[in-house]
């Protein structure tokens, strides 16, 4: 069954490769000022995190009842994702923030499992149509390395996020500019300020999309 599942996803994404190349790489959906915000926290052990935990705390304080944070490490310590519960959470969200540390140039295993299980369930039941049409995906990433490490001639953060971007674009979601911070390690004496500035960038990005939508410019 696992082999079939993986093969199915690969074939689906390959089949849409031509379609992807012609699609815009920015959000082109409509989001109102009342759009709900769903945060999927993909850190495998948030209690030991400083940057990710601080960012989530600021988001919760700022948005209050408008935001819902799902801590995958608390909900699924055994990696057994409750797909129906996750799809219910997705249903009313206008913005979906994927909050995670960059591990080996990708998402942590728990977040990858969430993506695989939740999206595959839509595919196998042929129930994907329209589910992500009016949703913006924001990759909010903390990075342990320095800015120089992810600057030309090296590969950029955006390059490492392409698989994630194309995964969500192929299902019809909007892809907002990612928000990321460097030097997110305990040895960084300015880590609290780094996390706060990351939060500010997230707020600015969300407000920008809401403002444009309210003006009817999309």
Description of each model-found segment:
Residues 1-27:
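Bacterial Sec-dependent N-terminal signal peptides
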Residues 27-65, 181:
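N-terminal beta1-alpha1 ligand-phosphate binding loop
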Residues 30-32, 128-134, 171:
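Short, conserved loop/helix-junction motifs that constitute active-site signature segments
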Residues 31, 36, 60, 163-218:
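Glycine-rich phosphate/pyrophosphate-binding loop and the adjoining helix
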Residues 38-40, 70, 97, 138-140, ...:
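Hydrophobic/aromatic beta-strand patches that form the interior of the parallel beta-sheet core
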Residues 65-78:
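A short beta-strand-loop structural module common to alpha/beta enzyme folds
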Residues 76-84, 187-194:
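Structural motif
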Residues 84-165:
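Helix-loop-strand module that forms the ligand-binding subsite of alpha/beta enzymes
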């Amino acid at each position: 069954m696992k082999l079939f599942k993986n093969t199915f996803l690969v074939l689906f994404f390959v089949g849409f490769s031509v379609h992807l190349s012609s699609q815009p790489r920015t959000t082109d959906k409509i989001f109102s000022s009342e759009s709900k915000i769903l945060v999927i926290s993909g850190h495998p052990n948030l209690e030991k995190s400083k940057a990710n935990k601080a960012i989530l705390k600021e988001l919760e304080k700022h948005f209050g009842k408008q935001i819902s944070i799902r801590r995958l490490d608390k909900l699924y310590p055994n990696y057994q994702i409750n797909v129906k519960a996750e799809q219910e959470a997705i249903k009313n969200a206008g913005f979906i923030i994927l909050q995670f540390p960059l591990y080996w140039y990708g998402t942590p295993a728990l977040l990858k499992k969430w993506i695989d299980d939740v999206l595959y369930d839509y595919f196998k039941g042929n129930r994907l149509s329209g589910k992500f049409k009016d949703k913006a995906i924001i990759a909010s990433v903390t990075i342990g390395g320095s800015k120089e490490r992810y600057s030309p001639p090296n590969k950029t953060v955006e390059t490492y996020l392409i698989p994630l971007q194309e995964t969500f674009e192929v299902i019809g979601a909007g892809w907002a500019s990612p928000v990321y911070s460097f030097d997110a390690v305990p040895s960084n004496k300015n880590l609290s300020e780094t996390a706060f500035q990351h939060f500010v960038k997230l707020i600015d990005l969300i407000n920008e999309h809401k403002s444009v939508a309210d003006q009817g410019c999309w």
